[in-house]
């Protein structure tokens, strides 16, 4: 996987998809009912493979029900966990070229299988998408997909995932002009830390 950059092209996403399916089938989400999990990159693009995954979840039909390493099943149907227990983001599919078109297409595919109520907007800016204009075009392209896609652009889903998000963000201010990250303290005092802007 290291040769020809295959890990970055395919391995990373494949590993995310495998981890997502393993997480659901392990029963961990049943044992920890309040646990919230964020899976990046639409779970490694799991939406494209869901018809195959769903079909093979039926262990009797696939002939693996009597094999211990294959017979463990979660309490709820597989889609329950996909639709109610996991959160996803839409980063990872948009760059460095044609970010808007490719990224928006990936959002369309993801939202065809996963509910917009569980998806967070994200980009790989500045690692993969390097131009501000491409990010703006990406946002516009996602908006063009309709109201379901536009829902992922606000902060409602992030607030479900991260308790007290608005209050936490209000305490953090980045002053790019002077290279200092300021964290406002309880009494209004600030803790200043130099920021290396080259990263």
Regions from the PLM with identified roles:
Residues 14-16, 90-99:
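Short, flexible loop segments at the rims of nucleotide/cofactor-binding pockets, characterized by
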